[in-house]
């Protein structure tokens, strides 16, 4: 009975993934057509506003699909985590935020590279959305890889920290994770961390804002 249930679940996931692939292709086609038509209209404040909306819709579509699809199809590979954190620091500074990075211990860890980068990028972009400075720190020992993302933003009250991992949740305070985003970033990040055998926790940062900690076995 357990084996039959497992087969049914796997079949349902496969059907869902196939359906999502078809839907995503159709929606991407429509959005691409919008972009081409807008490009023919020339430059004006109205056209630029519509272009921004279309870009936002495209980003939301990709986030929804990433959440529904998961990351289990990617193969694990040795990955330079220190180099990955440096890439995230540069991306953060390109968007106008101050950022620091530090890594301690052996830098190579076997993870699913694209998925793990998405996990960390979601945490860093969430921090940057509400703060002016983001500090990224990695540490690897013989058992665990730990990455912390600290910021100087408004933080999240202790009683709400688990709630922000729920998809599409809107907080009622200054740090609304859906502000300028899809409301899926932290949910996707935690799913990826857990699929690596680890987890993400949130706490108060010594910088005054939020500390997000990713911990996965090595």
Question: PLM features: residue spans?
Answer:
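Short beta-strand/loop element within the Bergerat-fold HATPase_c
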Residues: 133-143
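Membrane-proximal coiled-coil signaling linkers
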Residues: 7-52
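Conserved micro-motifs of the catalytic ATP-binding
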Residues: 70-74, 108-111
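Short alpha-helical Gxxx[C/S/T] motif in the catalytic ATP-binding
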Residues: 180, 185, 189
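Conserved glycine-rich
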Residues: 197-198
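Conserved catalytic submotifs in the C-terminal HATPase_c
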Residues: 98-110, 142, 207
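Short conserved segment of the HATPase_c
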Residues: 156-169
